């Protein structure tokens, strides 16, 4: 665990939303390594509080979110103009994304599609705002790295900002309080004009940092909202971070190349100096020639072989030879686990084929778990039955510190069961520590009780997470059902809070159990400040209750005054007693949660269920079709604050005849007429494409409306609508949060 060190001039506990917008053409390629070393890595260290490390699991819930947008030129057709990575809270993974950019194309163009990149970045900030509702305002920074002026063309791929020019986009960035910065290898007047137009209305800080921030007199570095080192280059820790990123191996020779990075990337910092007789442009050109030769020789179209040139200059080679790995198939039991950097992380705004969702880090709960051919997130039964579940095999070089049982409660799978009953699960587990570490576990009880907390509520506890020690949990796969349930819950946006009883005379009072989907291991964080951590958890739960109460009051006030005619009956239905709600539930069709359950269990799912028909808007059952509803979209009510709604959720109506009960334990039925924030059958990790379902469909069964088709792998990432919607990771319905928090409050 890396101790909680603060970066240069970095305020403690800074929660930031950072988006890097990078030109992915060959015009920037020869200069990117120098910009990365002198400006990008120091900026990441500033937001991360120190050099990014692969073992820093505390950063998974530290609050700061990073996202990457790569834009091209018009000659990239028919490919999408922009590639967008889903947000991550791991600075180390963000560095691997930077190293995986393929700088290609744009040789015949003097401009680049900066407007497309900035419009996608604005959509990301809109999504960040929805994710940050629990903690309020954050420090937002947009960093543009390019080497060409913008086209005089408006953005076309973005749905929200289509038609906006580059200048209007940077003005929107400044008006929304987003700090806009530019890094370019040469001084371009057009880019400086963009920086000036992005100045906030009331500029309270200097226009730019001192001139000596640039490490090269030819560079143009205009920054707001962050501090870069003045003079000198980046620290050795940043270079070691670069060294620790392995090259992604080709799938055909994964076992051979997995052992190659230690030899191909020797841990000697002086080797990051490029030989004097090779310029960066020559290195890029030779790599391109090698890549072309490998394509002709049939060695794979996307990867260049590891050659002596890369061994001589590893600091320059990876940015030009590294590429995102192709979609991965589920790893069979016992197969060697590829290195973390070989897993795909690029989520394009328009997927050209069946692309599988990326295994995400715990900080981005939306894309957790391995994507199986059925489209179900989470490890398969065959993988769970494998020897020690892949990543858990790494406990062989650790010391056993404690052995006992972990117990937790979850909702039973059939939704028809009384919601007041909880299903108690337990698994034998062992706690391991590294050699040389001393963990006093003599006074630990034999049974640890774990409660589940939505990880969104933990974003403000970043400093406490960093100031903690790390242990590894290993679970015995004797009970496959319990083990699958643990993987499903921990991989879908929840963290485990393990409480130690006050009767036990041990030093530890609370322990956080986190799941790393990339390494397939469970990590335990033991904060050094135990009392501060307990108080922090109590504070975030209290704040969550207050925020939900305020939202409920605002919804009632808004619904009584400004609700459109179509939404009026909905608010009236929500205000009626529970028995009326139960009567209204009867004539409705199959519950939406059952549709999600059919997708989760591999049953046929009707196509087009993600988005409503565009021909006629759907209203409540029995209401005539009217104009599309306008006004604010209401969030689901807080069942803890509304006793009537809570009693309804805790005592659902009996299942309808001919309708299978929902099988997914994490899907909850919503009150009738309440608009859904996300389509109920859509898992939290899948992007939201197309219009949202604002009303339940008419009283007809699904098979009579749409023909049934088996779900295809990756179908949730494909959409026939306009290109450009950005995934909304980490967005969870407040109904689920409150349901879990009932055990804590």
Swiss-Prot record:
For the region Interaction with the Mediator complex, give the residue spans.
1-226
Biased composition range(s): Low complexity: 252-262, 596-617
Q: In this chain, where does the modification Asymmetric dimethylarginine occur?
A: 723
Pfam families, sorted: Med25, Med25_SD1, Med25_VWA
Q: Outline the segment boundaries, as ranges, of region: Disordered.
A: 233-266, 299-374, 584-738
| Sequence ranges of Pro residues compositional bias | 324-342, 618-631, 652-663
**Ranges where the record places region Interaction with RARA:** 563-652, 639-705
Biological role: Component of the Mediator complex, a coactivator involved in the regulated transcription of nearly all RNA polymerase II-dependent genes. Mediator functions as a bridge to convey information from gene-specific regulatory proteins to the basal RNA polymerase II transcription machinery. Mediator is recruited to promoters by direct interactions with regulatory proteins and serves as a scaffold for the assembly of a functional preinitiation complex with RNA polymerase II and the general transcription factors. Required for RARA/RXRA-mediated transcription.
Q: What is this protein called?
A: Mediator of RNA polymerase II transcription subunit 25
Source taxonomy lineage? Eukaryota, Metazoa, Chordata, Craniata, Vertebrata
Which gene produces this protein? Med25
